[in-house]
């Protein structure tokens, strides 16, 4: 999804389930070295960095992992509430939903919530190499059509697909 080039600076939010590769993608996009861990709750506050592409500056906000954006009266952790409040506040011009391609069904619950919110959305299928190793075949075009937004496959840990994501 192209962001209109009316101004030189744009704000992008990375949102997704815990342990789906948000911070790894954030580091690949921005060149940062944020701490990455193989457990939920590593990112408990929003972190920001930037990158430039085609003469434009993009600020990227790495939100804590969350399974849901529900605003119902249920007990949520601090990291979930940070992500939920940020997305509900419509601060970002584009929400990039990082989805673990090897656990697609579980991750798409959050994606469907974002689609229903009608936020400007781009879905990143991360860890497509792991999905392929598990014998999973994902029809990226069909998924994009079904969701009504662009879908970009990447392997953030290796930087594969990051240039295509920046161009999207």
PLM regions: where:
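Hydrophobic residues at beta-strand termini and immediately following loops
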Residues: 44, 152-154
């Amino acid at each position: 999804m192209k962001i209109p080039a009316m101004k030189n600076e744009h704000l992008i939010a990375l949102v997704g389930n815990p342990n789906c590769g948000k911070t790894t993608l954030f580091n690949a996009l921005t060149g940062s070295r944020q701490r990455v861990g193989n457990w939920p709750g590593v990112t408990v506050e929003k972190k920001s960095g930037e990158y430039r592409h085609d003469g434009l500056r993009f600020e990227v906000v790495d939100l804590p992992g969350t399974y849901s954006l529900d605003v119902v009266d249920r007990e949520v952790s601090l990291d979930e509430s940070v992500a939920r409040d940020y997305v509900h506040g419509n601060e970002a011009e584009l929400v990039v939903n990082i989805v673990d391609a090897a656990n697609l069904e579980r991750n798409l619950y959050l994606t469907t919530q974002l689609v229903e919110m009608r936020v400007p959305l781009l879905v990143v299928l991360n860890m497509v190499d792991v999905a392929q190793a598990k014998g999973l075949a994902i029809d990226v075009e069909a998924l994009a059509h079904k969701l009504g937004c662009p879908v970009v496959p990447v392997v953030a840990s290796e930087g594969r697909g990051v240039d295509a994501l920046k161009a999207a």
